[in-house]
């Protein structure tokens, strides 16, 4: 049976030492004793860090030492509900990215070009979350950048080289590793051209950024300031080749569905044409018909679209998908709040109808999965405020009436057999 020693007290004769780092029990917070050895809390934390790093890159590998698309999508499925096609495209892209790097190291006559990806989908459908989940499960440097903060060189804001700087930081400034990394650029629809006439004014945060991104996305040797750019003009620059860096761009492209629908209406003229009202079709359904010309009309320049050969559209999340998002993934919202309540020794439970009502509210707000947390916070706010002061509460039950605001959460007390509704206002 192991014992735990604190850091206070004891004379020098009976002082215990960590068998790994050699620190005494007085130099650490805790010392855990085994049959013949001791380990301190600092060494335990170090071991946990090593295990986490091992787990991060412990995916099943194919014969070439490359993570298989099936394995990548299997891990994505644990965290992200739905969007099967987008997950398939991302899994294949990452798999091919590894293979291309492996092929480049072996040499050969055929040079494998990279296929950058554009993710298009309505807000709250999981574009950014897919990228964040991908970052956790791959073992190449990965960084996320926000396109809204970028400006053309020479203007107030971030240079596009700052994206490569973030990738360098995620690779601990190892240039070789950074050159094999993956970059996700979010909110790329916000850098669309502000006007159809390019000669009206200089568009430093729109078309100017697209022009600046062209070369690093295609492949160039970028000069990256290690201290972050314009504030330190005397610093030496690091040279990073972006040829093998995979770029994934994502955006909601609000209004793109109307451009696609308008194009469809032009081609559906005549007595035999099938007329479908735009209001009868969901955004995700319309986006499936996306063509590069629609993105040009939206405000992306043709050269920028040409650097993103793979187009992946994401679906709207329906009621059933939102219910699954609430309860099924490893870090589902319901599980997160249940863990919060467990810290107060209280069980939190939701009726099935309550989850369905939450999903309906999110659909009404048109915020997708992103709106689920704000709805949950509003429902549970009063309960989380009162609970620390209440004694004997064993369980809190949320019904559909609670979600609609027609009732209070049900409090079940440990010292009573009957269920007691919370009467306080």
Curated annotation (Swiss-Prot):
Pfam families: AAA_2, ClpB_D2-small, zf-C4_ClpX. SMART domains: AAA, ClpB_D2-small, zf-C4_ClpX. It comes from the Bacteria. Residues 6-59 form the ClpX-type ZB domain. GO terms for molecular function: ATP binding; ATP hydrolysis activity; ATP-dependent protein folding chaperone; protein dimerization activity; unfolded protein binding; zinc ion binding. One of its GO terms (cellular component) is HslUV protease complex. CDD domains: RecA-like_ClpX. Disulfide bonds: none annotated. Keywords: ATP-binding, Chaperone, Metal-binding, Nucleotide-binding, Zinc. ATP-dependent specificity component of the Clp protease. It directs the protease to specific substrates. Can perform chaperone functions in the absence of ClpP. Belongs to the ClpX chaperone family. This is ATP-dependent Clp protease ATP-binding subunit ClpX.
